[in-house]
Amino acid sequence: MPIKLQKLPAAVRWGLAVLCAAVCGVLWAYYWRVFFGLDNRVSPLVVTLGCAAFLEVCLLAGYCVRRFAKGFAAKGAVCIFLCGLLFAFANPPLQTPDEADHYLRTYAISTGHFDFDASRTYPDDVAYLLEAFPGAWVNAHTSAGVGTDPDTGAEKAYNTAGYALKQYGKDGAVQSMADSFALYLAHDVRDSVPDPVSEPVSFLVIPFLPGAVGMALARLLGFGALGCLYGGRIVNLLAYTLLCALALAKAERYRPAFAAIMLLPMSLFMGSSLSYDATLLGCYYLMLALLTRREWNTQTVGIYTAACIFVNIAKPYLNLLWVLPIFLVAKREWHAKGRRPLWALGGFGGAMAVTLLTEWYGTAFRYNYPMIERQGGSTVNGGEQLAFVLRNPLRTIAAFWGTLGENDFFIGQLGLFGWKDLPISFLNLTGPLVLLLAALLAAAQPKHADAFPTRRRVGGAALLALVYAAGAMAAMYITYTPVGMVRIVGLQARYFLCVWLALLPALAVLLRKTICPAITEEKAEAAITPLCACYAIFGAVLLFQHYFVGPVYVVYA
């Protein structure tokens, strides 16, 4: 007769879990050693003990969350922060999009420089860091050519794009991100001095303040450039976590969808970086969470307006769309001081004010910068591109649709990391399935019989998502894409994370009406956090694996 685990004493259950974690760690290490030839690079004992210890620590963390964190929001926040820490260290330095520029601007702010001076240089330690870890590391180390297959003697083309590790010949040394760490850590004994690094073409201050606080604390503790990077990442992650915790606490419905999006590897990858996307995504998630509240009081609309104004500091103009959802709140649900049009007007005015103030500040306190050329070169011209779009609307629609199709509608690129140069196939394939699972659990039977949010809220949020997605594509097409090009340059999956979150409640409503899931809301919320946390941990492991362990591309030159 099978033994039911629920009837076993808690100590026995956790003891079995510890044993299973140790066994899985040994098997995991064995897989790495066999499939990626890790024995030639690292001691088998170190790999085995490391994998087993890692899983035991994860199990201990899971026990502590289950034992001490009270409530859905608290459990979710702790899981977000702990899983984000894994991404902060699994992701090599400066490998988030534009993180090199973000690092330099954040570092300058952390030293008390709130202006922008192109003649100001950084310490040699920072220059060594940027030399060892170029942005888009995988692309920077990609090689292509024609070699000779030693087994057949035939010529064979090779291209290492998408591979962080490569090996020249069967017996050659494996080149990986570990070499960059070795290069940076050995800079004290090197004779050469790197070229000086000056301030980047980046003129924002407020979005980089959390990371700057982390860097300042790291410097006070005696850390160098690399330690400052991780200190900035951790405090940025803390800011992301706090915003997500507030969103989970304020959301009254569809909380499994929010937890799933917040714990997506792509969200944690950005949230644990030096990018201002950490706070930007947190504010997006918070505003959407507030739309699930039945009644809006002054505090609710105040938080929403503050988040709306902040996102317009980091990403101006397009984010003015976030003023409109205030009108999705019906009059009978509005209990704030002041009427909806006044709050919407105040939000719009505040957003425009901070946008114009940010632009003025970035110009007034900018020194010694030469003429700043357009990104993309002389072929990019916003005015000409806009005129081209207006003259050729059908061609523009075709370009938009073709770009979406070529990029798997960006829902199939939730595992594309680095500077879009490190694809992880497993996460690309399973990302949409995780979102579907989130929608299914969000479609659980509500605690109360009356349906809320209303169709007005859910449908309005979905419409906002589609308009926002089209606006993001149009903005990149006009400002970054050469005139008349049939593809949009610069679009990334991270731009659409808030879009998927806004669409999930609409999908949940559809699923509830078609398949009527029997699971209750309490059980759905209890299941989503551990499931998505495990997925996030696995995502962090895969990110580390692809940079440091394998797969290895063997080049026969």
What are these regions (language model features)?
Residues 13-17, 71, 223-226, 245-265:
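Transmembrane-helix signature of polytopic, membrane-embedded enzymes
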Residues 246, 279-296, 503-506:
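Specific aromatic-rich, kink-prone transmembrane helix
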Residues 290-299, 321-352:
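Perimembrane helix-loop-helix junctions
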